[in-house]
Amino acid sequence: DRNTSGIVIAGKNSEALRQINEAVKLKSIKKYYKTLVCGKIEKSGRLEDFYEKDSQLNKAKVGGKEGKIITTIYRPLKTNGRYTLAEVELITGKSHQIRVHMASAGFPIIGDVKYGNKQENEYFRKKAGVKRQMLHAYKMVFEGLKGELAYLNGKTVTADVPKDFKCAEKEIFGI
């Protein structure tokens, strides 16, 4: 998603891109995100739902009876009872997946204008200058890669959260 910060993976040429796409499909590249959400997440969970996307409205929905199955795993890292810093692992990778899945589970992402809570977003805009969703691709783990990408096996790439994320985190947890 355009307003998500963090690691972006790209291929230098069409063959490298094909191999990356194949590796993602085979789960040889694992993607992890940090997010700040409304609500108290007490324990780890796994979300699995049918996913549909309306391309004209550029909006996704989950929980119907048809579409593609998507899977998202989440783990609470820290909570104050009202908000939670969570790690999210993408098992499937659809557009808006984390945002729509977390919102449907009752944990909308702070700053998400499409699936989030308007009042909470306004509060964080005023108090911490939040102008985008607090979703950050912070880690990629490479394992089981073949061919030209095999040199990445066993490697982990990480990216620190940006300043706006830290400001929102400070507002919540006083860090």
What is the meaning of each model-derived region?
Residues D1-L26:
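Glycine/acidic-rich beta-strand-loop module
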Residues T4, K31, L47, I70-I73, ...:
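A generic structural signal for well-ordered coil/turn residues at beta-strand boundaries
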Residues K34-L36, K139:
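Residues embedded in well-ordered beta-strands
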Residues E89:
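Polynucleotide-recognition surfaces of large bacterial nucleic-acid defense/processing enzymes
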Residues H96-I98:
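Short, well-structured beta-strand segments within conserved domains
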Residues H101-I175:
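Pseudouridine synthases involved in rRNA/tRNA modification
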